[in-house]
């Protein structure tokens, strides 16, 4: 089975995130995508709140998609969330006979060498990297450009910002078209202050 893992803050999840999931399902022949809202990020100060809300939004968006699972594996974990640790848990749950993929943005690939056990990660899974549509200036290390376990997609990266959405909600601006209409009211209620 081909399993893609899509971790992130999803603070909140928006249409751009959904389009990436749709693209991977339709074009890369995945059997399953596991959406994992981060618990405590390892790469920045913990300014994430509303874990339950972020999880609820993701679940609501994908509740009718049998190929998408939303997991609380990192939210329930103690301490900082590391992709390496999460992947090992998922391999234990689903079995090592499956093929695992990690979905990331080009900015994450640029910093991959700072990730915990990144070389071992590259042996345990393949990385699906979405390039940003408007930013071709990010330099990618040759080690990654020539690695068979890194798939760089020159596909449009759906450039919507969760920060932009939170700011619009705080300023009582319309977020239609930026978030799934199924969760628009929930986002407006939960992110108002």
Swiss-Prot record:
Keyword set includes Transcription: no
Superkingdom of this protein's organism: Bacteria
GO BP terms, alphabetized: NAD biosynthetic process
EC id: 2.7.7.18
Family annotation (SUPFAM superfamilies): Nucleotidylyl transferase (SSF52374)
Gene3D superfamilies assigned to the protein according to its UniProt record, in alphabetical order: HUPs (3.40.50.620)
Keywords: ATP-binding, NAD, Nucleotide-binding, Nucleotidyltransferase, Pyridine nucleotide biosynthesis, Transferase
CDD domains registered for this protein in UniProt: NMNAT (cd02165)
MF term (GO), any: nicotinate-nucleotide adenylyltransferase activity
Reaction(s) catalysed by this chain's protein: nicotinate beta-D-ribonucleotide + ATP + H(+) = deamido-NAD(+) + diphosphate
Pathway as given in its UniProt record: Cofactor biosynthesis; NAD(+) biosynthesis; deamido-NAD(+) from nicotinate D-ribonucleotide: step 1/1
Listed InterPro entries: Cyt_trans-like, NadD/NMNAT, Rossmann-like_a/b/a_fold
UniProt entry tagged with the keyword Nucleus: no
PANTHER family, per database record: NICOTINATE-NUCLEOTIDE ADENYLYLTRANSFERASE-RELATED (PTHR39321), PHOSPHOPANTETHEINE ADENYLYLTRANSFERASE (PTHR39321:SF3)
HAMAP family to which the protein is assigned, alphabetical: NaMN_adenylyltr
Record function comment: Catalyzes the reversible adenylation of nicotinate mononucleotide (NaMN) to nicotinic acid adenine dinucleotide (NaAD).
Family listed: Belongs to the NadD family.
Name the record gives this protein: Probable nicotinate-nucleotide adenylyltransferase
